[in-house]
């Protein structure tokens, strides 16, 4: 590997703002609602990316692995969330660390990292097999992981001691007065209105930026990432409240009032964080903002009442009802999905059959896949279920009210994935420009490596967006 004076190169910060949508971004900027996004866009080269995948391979945990490795799904083969460690290719941060640069990976989805990494790595909160590095990050990682994995559940499995340990960690690792004030306002608002708990996602990301900022100042990394997901969640759950005219299923006036601004609130919350990041890193750092993919309205289920999702209230109760008795460990993932890890393949195979035997009205209730000694499962029912629905075990007299074991996730699902994504690159040595031709996600890793003076590995077939002989095409500069 050839390295050309990395220490003299400009650092690179990769902002990973999952699934933000180009058309919504442009609309909110035009309305004057996102001043910091506008400032970044006006100083960047602007691209639209193509994920170059279609369902079932159009998923963020697949696309982000492509961004980080520079190879498509057909080569990295990572299909599920929390399986990032299975991809053999090195990530961008592995190559930077190997070249002698410090790295700070803050929340990147489906990540893995080489032993002895020069820097800090905080995996995404859905990771079940990845641990943060160094161990000093464990109090933060475990607290956020439980909050995110149980975000839709009223009962988050955290003790007073867990909260106290987390507060101690944050006080020593960047907790800002602004974030503390946001927490206080959120708790007061929840108590007064007895609702609005969904806004806690924005608070968690303020905390994440506090931590990112503290480590960034301490480490001064050559390459860093910062991942955010709250707005992707808002788009999935609340698109119908943003554009109710597109949907056939009516919503109550009360819910319309509460959720009509949820997506806008998500973009505005991220806009504030982007402003803080730009202030933190200054004007001399290369900033790359990517979304990997985006979303669009999900209208496919309107004839059957809209797309629904159901999640176990307590995984142990569902597993006991299914008749699974082998030693196991449950790891919630995203939304309704979860892993059950067993001690051997035989136990996992037996558990798979028991979960597949659960039915509602003659229809399978669970989608189940086994991967060696692990079982990946989720409720596969997508229609509205009546309160008196019964969950049954096939070829037995065992049954239980469905809602004794499951709850309906708030908001249903009214946003779905789209292969287009946002890519803005602010390079102090290049002119702002708008590029009309779409680019593949595989070009992002080579672009970052070239910016840092690191030769890309042979397995990366994509080309840098900044080949030395190709200048950017300038556009009229907009002063802000």
Residue ranges and their predicted role:
Residues 2-8, 79-81, 89, 94, ...:
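Membrane-interface soluble catalytic domains
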Residues 11-18:
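Short, hydrophobic/glycine-enriched beta-strand segments
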Residues 16, 48, 102-108, 121, ...:
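A structural signal for short, well-ordered beta-strand segments and their strand-loop junctions
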Residues 19-22, 55-56, 72-74, 103, ...:
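Short, solvent-exposed loop/turn segments at secondary-structure junctions
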Residues 25-62, 71, 102-106:
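Short, structured active-site-proximal loop/turn typified by the sulfatase FGly-forming signature C/S-X-P-X-R
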Residues 28-32, 119-123, 240-244, 300-311:
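Short secondary-structure boundary/capping segments
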Residues 36, 265-304, 423, 448:
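Metal-dependent active-site segment of extracytoplasmic phospho-/sulfohydrolases and closely related
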Residues 69-246, 250-253, 337-339:
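His/Asp/Glu-rich, glycine-adjacent segments
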């Amino acid at each position: 590997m050839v390295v050309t004076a990395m220490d003299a190169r400009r650092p690179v910060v990769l902002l990973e703002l999952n699934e933000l949508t180009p058309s919504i971004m442009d609309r909110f900027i035009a309305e004057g609602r996102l001043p910091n996004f506008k400032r970044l866009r006006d100083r960047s080269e602007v691209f639209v990316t193509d994920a170059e995948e279609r369902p079932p391979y159009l998923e963020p945990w697949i696309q982000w692995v492509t961004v980080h490795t520079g190879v498509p799904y057909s080569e990295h083969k990572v299909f599920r969330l929390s399986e990032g460690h299975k991809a053999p290719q090195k990530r961008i941060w592995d190559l930077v660390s190997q070249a002698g640069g410090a790295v700070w990976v803050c929340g990147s989805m489906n990540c893995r990292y080489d032993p002895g990494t020069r820097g800090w790595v905080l995996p995404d909160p859905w990771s079940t097999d990845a641990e943060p590095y160094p161990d000093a990050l464990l109090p933060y990682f475990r607290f956020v992981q439980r909050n995110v994995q149980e975000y839709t559940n009223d009962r988050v499995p955290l003790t007073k001691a867990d909260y106290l340990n987390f507060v101690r960690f944050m006080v020593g690792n960047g907790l800002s007065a602004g974030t503390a004030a946001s927490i206080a306002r959120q708790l007061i608002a929840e108590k007064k209105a007895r609702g609005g708990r969904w806004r806690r996602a924005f608070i968690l990301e303020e905390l994440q930026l506090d931590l990112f900022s503290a480590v960034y100042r301490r480490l001064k990394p050559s390459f860093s990432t910062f991942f955010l997901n709250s707005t992707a969640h808002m788009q999935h759950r609340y698109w119908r409240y943003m554009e109710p005219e597109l949907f056939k299923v009516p919503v109550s006036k009360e819910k319309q009032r509460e959720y009509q601004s949820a997506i806008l609130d998500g973009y505005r919350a991220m806009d504030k964080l982007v402003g803080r990041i730009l202030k933190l890193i200054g004007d001399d750092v290369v900033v790359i903002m990517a979304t990997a993919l985006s979303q669009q309205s999900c209208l496919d289920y309107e004839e059957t009442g809209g797309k629904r999702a159901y999640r176990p209230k307590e995984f142990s109760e569902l597993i006991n009802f299914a008749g699974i008795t082998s030693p196991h460990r449950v790891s919630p993932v995203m939304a309704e999905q979860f892993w059950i890890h067993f001690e051997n393949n035989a136990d996992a195979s037996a558990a798979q059959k028991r979960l597949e035997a659960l039915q509602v009205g003659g229809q399978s209730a669970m989608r189940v896949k086994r991967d060696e000694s692990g079982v990946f499962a989720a409720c596969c029912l997508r229609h509205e279920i009546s309160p008196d629905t019964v969950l049954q075990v096939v070829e037995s007299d065992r049954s239980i009210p469905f809602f004794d074991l499951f709850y309906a996730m708030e908001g249903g699902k009214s946003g779905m994935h789209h292969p287009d994504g946002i890519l803005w690159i602010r390079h102090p040595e290049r002119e702002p420009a708008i590029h009309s031709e779409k680019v593949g996600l595989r070009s992002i890793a080579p672009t970052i490596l070239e910016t840092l003076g690191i030769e890309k590995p042979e397995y990366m077939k994509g080309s840098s967006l900044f080949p030395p002989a190709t200048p950017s095409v300038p556009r009229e500069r907009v002063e802000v």
